[in-house]
Regions:
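Helix-terminus/linker motif at the lipid-water interface of multi-pass membrane proteins
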Residues: 31, 35-54, 123-130, 186-195, ...
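Transmembrane helical elements of multi-pass membrane transporters/channels
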Residues: 21-40, 142, 176, 205-209, ...
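Short alpha-helical transmembrane segments in multi-pass integral membrane proteins
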Residues: 1-23, 81-146, 179, 190-246, ...
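Short runs within selected transmembrane alpha-helices of multi-pass transporters and secretion channels
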Residues: 74, 142-161, 169-177, 198-213, ...
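Alpha-helical transmembrane segments of multi-pass membrane transport proteins
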Residues: 17, 32-33, 70-71, 111, ...
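Residue-level signal for short hydrophobic patches within transmembrane helices
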Residues: 12, 16-35, 39, 62-69, ...
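Small-residue-rich hydrophobic transmembrane alpha-helices
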Residues: 53-113, 150-169, 263, 276-334, ...
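Alpha-helical transmembrane segments of multipass membrane proteins
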Residues: 38-42, 113, 121, 155-159, ...
Length: 455
């Protein structure tokens, strides 16, 4: 197969070293994306007040609800491209590239239309506080206008990750992150644009990163080359992307739905708790994305090794990714708990907001390694070709459990803590079932001569 300029063989050599080298730029890229939101939250909280902070921060679960289905499709693009690359199938990689970029643009336009026109109605369904809803709706409408560029970046960077290139997406986001911070300061402080300014800064910076990473694909030689004149859907590639991506996207969407229900319950405690929870959630994101880099590594490494038929590497890949996720969760999650009050000061100087934020932070970050284990096991199953199985397990073990918890246990003791504790409980149960499924799948693969039959 014609190698791309920055591709990497993830099927041979020291796996732990390769996983770490692959994951560090990936984690840094994800953290830079979080810095977009952190810059929004910090600037608006400091210079536009607690109401504006709540307006920006409380939108995360709703944005994820609308976006995650299509982000799941980009995971499908990553798995299919990685498997074709591992199998040295140039034609398959090329079809996946053209189909993925087209799918990214189409899904982005669809999200922009739905998000723009449904923003206020969805916020009302979530019981968004009256003093926040107007600003929240304004932020959402502007944010979703930029969704085509966000989706274009997600799908294009997924293709680069599939061939082992995680550094160049990092460079794109670094440039965009600097632009985002500068524009935040200019729009909010210089022009007093409040939430409209931070939303506008975000979509401009995301447009920059999307254009950069797409340009990289256009300049590629070989199978990863993007030809804008040949954009379109190749049915074989599209079917494979949907088979992997739709279950992952549906899982993420229902996860987000359960989080929307939780956010609605948080909203019932007033704007102070909403602001504190929003600040904590932003900090939690840094711990999660660092762990999630190893979950994404598990998908790409297992997919390439499946394509190359190097089944003997699969157990090493999964164990090494789990080890890295656990260590990251312990170190960063524990550090966030220890320094939580000081970190929350960056988001607000209001003592009540900080106290409300720390109540959430100590529960979530203190147990976040459990989420890392759960996600890595689920990603490993997807990389092996089993996309429906982890979806069903996650929907029942996490989402349904949280909804039942809110309808029963939470009603007996309506406090923020009783909402937050539902997260680690669901992570433990779901991770245990994922582990059992993975052990059964590997046993069946060995029994039938390591021939994969996708669920």
């Amino acid at each position: 197969m014609a190698q791309t300029s920055r591709s990497a063989d993830l099927t041979s050599g020291p796996m732990l070293q390769k996983i770490i080298l692959f994951s560090i730029p990936l984690a840094a890229s994800s953290i830079l994306q979080l810095l977009f939101n952190a810059a929004d939250v910090v600037v608006v909280g400091r210079f536009a007040g607690s109401t504006a902070l709540a307006a920006v921060g409380s939108n995360g679960s709703l944005i994820n609800l609308l976006v995650n289905l299509f982000v799941g499709l980009s995971l499908g693009a990553n798995v299919v491209a990685a498997r074709c690359f591992g199998a040295k199938d140039d034609h398959g990689v090329q079809d996946t590239v053209q189909t993925s970029v087209t799918l990214g643009l189409v899904s982005g336009v669809l999200l922009a239309v739905v998000g723009f026109f449904a923003a206020r109605g969805l916020l009302e369904l979530m019981s968004c506080p009256e003093d926040v809803i107007d600003l929240s709706a304004l932020y959402l409408k502007i944010y979703f206008i930029g969704m085509p560029m966000t989706m274009l970046y997600n799908f294009s960077s997924a293709l680069l990750r599939a061939v082992g290139d995680t550094k160049r997406p990092l460079y794109c986001l670094a440039a965009a992150g600097i632009i985002n911070v500068v524009l935040n300061l200019v729009f909010v402080i210089g022009f007093s644009m409040s939430v409209a300014g931070v939303a506008l800064a975000t979509i401009i910076s995301q447009t920059v990163s999307a254009c950069m990473v797409t340009r990289m694909l256009m300049k590629e030689e070989g199978a990863l080359h993007l030809d804008l004149h040949h954009l379109g859907f190749h049915m074989g590639a599209l079917k494979q992307i949907l088979l992997i991506g739709l279950p992952a996207g549906l899982q993420s969407t229902v996860f987000s739905l359960s989080n929307v229900v939780i956010q609605s319950a948080i909203n019932s405690f007033g704007s102070t708790v909403v602001a504190g929870s929003s600040a904590s959630a932003n900090l939690e994101g840094f711990v999660y994305t660092a762990m999630n880099a190893f979950s994404q590594a598990a998908v790409t490494f297992t997919s390439q090794n499946m394509g190359a038929r190097k089944y003997q590497n699969l157990n090493r890949v999964v164990l090494n990714c789990l080890l890295c996720a656990i260590v990251t969760g312990v170190v960063l999650g524990g550090g966030a708990v220890l320094a939580g009050t000081q970190l929350l000061h960056f988001y607000s100087s209001d003592a009540a907001v900080i106290a409300a934020g720390y109540e959430r932070l100590r529960v979530i970050c203190g147990t976040y390694l459990l989420c890392g284990i759960m996600d890595t096991l689920a990603s490993s199953l997807r990389g092996l070709g089993y996309s429906v199985l982890p979806m069903v397990v996650s929907l029942v073990g996490s989402c349904l459990l949280r909804l039942v918890w809110i309808a029963t246990i939470f009603q007996l003791n309506r406090t923020p803590f009783m909402l937050y504790i539902s997260y680690p409980i669901s992570w433990v149960l779901t991770a245990a079932v994922h582990l059992a499924c993975l052990l059964v799948v590997r046993h069946k693969m060995r029994q039938r001569g390591q021939t994969l039959k996708a669920a």
